Amino acid sequence: MQDERRHYQGRVSELAIVYLGLGSNLGEREENLCQALTLLSRKVSLEEVSSVYETEPVGYKEQPLFLNLVCRVTTRLRPEELLHLAKEIEARMGRIPSFPNAPRPIDIDILFYDNKIVKTQNLIIPHPRLQERAFVLIPLAEIAPDLVHPEMEKSIAELANDVKGQSGVRKLTGGFDVSAICGRAL
């Protein structure tokens, strides 16, 4: 029997801890990640950012390699408001709705929102394919290895250890120093 208290009820009175996945494979990929983090930081509090990983595309293979990272933010935005913010930033940065797994200047996915389970017509949290994606699990395990998936009841470290496609995920040396790449602290 599921614990109904974990299901999102539509209100946020306290800060929510949220994990976001960001990816870019068009244009200046590092700059795209930096710009997206900067735009996000105007509406949410950026708490921690993983290293940047260069990853092979999933699904549609005939496209450039991605740069991916995961960040932890805190926010009072409700899940739907956060989704709206993510889509707004993607559009502002030139993402045009296309076919699934298409190349894009930026992609922002809500991976986890506290320990909540959200299932609406427009939004599913935890992200529905998270457990299949090495390009998400490996950077997420870097900053939140002990985080437990509320439906699978496994830690992110366990999921990352078991995921296929690990060889297609390469950590960039030097990490991702937000202040160095963006030219300022967020």
Task: Name each region found by the language model.
Residues 23, 72-76, 113:
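Solvent-exposed residues in well-ordered beta-strands and their adjoining turns
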Residues 35-79:
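Short, surface-exposed acidic-centric catalytic microdomains
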Residues 5-10, 50, 57-65, 83-84, ...:
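Flexible, gly/pro- and Lys/Arg-enriched active-site loops
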Residues 4-43, 50-56:
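N-terminal beta1-alpha1 ligand-phosphate binding loop
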